[in-house]
Amino acid sequence: MPFEQISWLQDVREYRRVAKNRKALREPGKGTDYTHERFRDAVNRVVARIHPKRMNLRVKEILPQTAAAKTFCFERVDGPLPPFRAGQYVNVMVTVEGVRTSRPYSISSAPGAQRLELTLRNKPEGFVAPYLFNTLKVGDVLETTGPAGHFYYEPLIDGEDLVFLAGGSGITPFMSMIRDAIQQQLPLKIHLLYGCRMPEDVIFKSELEMLAAHHPGLTFSPVLSEPPDGYEGLKGFLDSTLMERLVGDVKGKTFYLCGPRVMHDFCVAALKELKVPQRKIRQELYGAPEDVSQEPGWPEGLSGDMVFEVEVAEKKMILARAGEPLLNALERGGLKLPALCRSGECSACRIRLLTGKVFVPSQAKVRESDRKAGYIHSCVSYPVGNLKIRM
């Protein structure tokens, strides 16, 4: 057994042993040889290993997937890899053009693997993805958060008949889920519908075809929106007609969505046509809309290029464009905020809005308690005037 696993088990045994003495530790004169500090330290050590706030990951191997996608295989250099749920992500911290920022990337490897894999698709119009795709090499070390997110299989809630709707690089959490389900021999029926533009855009194509051929519980249906002449596979978009044709009766099925925002809007509308209950639709959204000015409710006549002043707790003034998330402007101004999902769900980047107004897309998952307390999630908040905030 590797040393890291032995050390981990020792920490778990330590925790279980001292946990039995918690009551005695609180009663003077009845304690064991353990002190409160030793108990606390043992618990904290286990928690830090299982749920690390930060990790340093070294690139061990780079696997080409398509012309525009690569899988980066990492080993952890500051401890053992923590456990995670298939479908979770890590947030990668980088400095690009002098700006310290971060982006969440789904883990594509299965839990329990000897290395952690992130599969990235190059987006020329992006900021972080092109930097990682074009500069990251074997031996480089990245700082990331520990695994996070709630986009994973819940057996007691989701049942055993699952439909995965993927688009582009949104295939990555599903690869982790599929690999995990097969390795654990879970009694699941999985329908994977994968929307791409052209045949060369299908990530993991060979592996998915092989897995579907050897596991009757998995069906794999790539759907191309811009197929070449003579293509005999599925064509078009993941609309209600195609879904019903491929998965049959939707009753009792749980639908998972991961892909571009435009795909989410399209697929959610299709699922509503099929009368799929909202509780049976699970979504994973990363990042901000590509063009927030096209979102419902955007102020009429406001250009996304309009620039506003943002005063940060009477200490600093920065400039922010209406068409970019406030978090991006704060990072560009040299301010450090914690961030995870960058889609409004986790609330890690919340700040207090003192004066001014922001636009928040309707699909952003902002907690009602934060709204009432005057907090905004900076990753999904867009200035529509001058602001004053407190971090």
Language-model region placement:
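FNR/FR-type flavoprotein reductase catalytic core
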Residues: 1-17, 130-312
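A short, compositionally biased
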Residues: 86-88, 301-308, 345-347, 383
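C-terminal accessory/binding modules appended to enzymatic or scaffolding proteins
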Residues: 304-345, 354
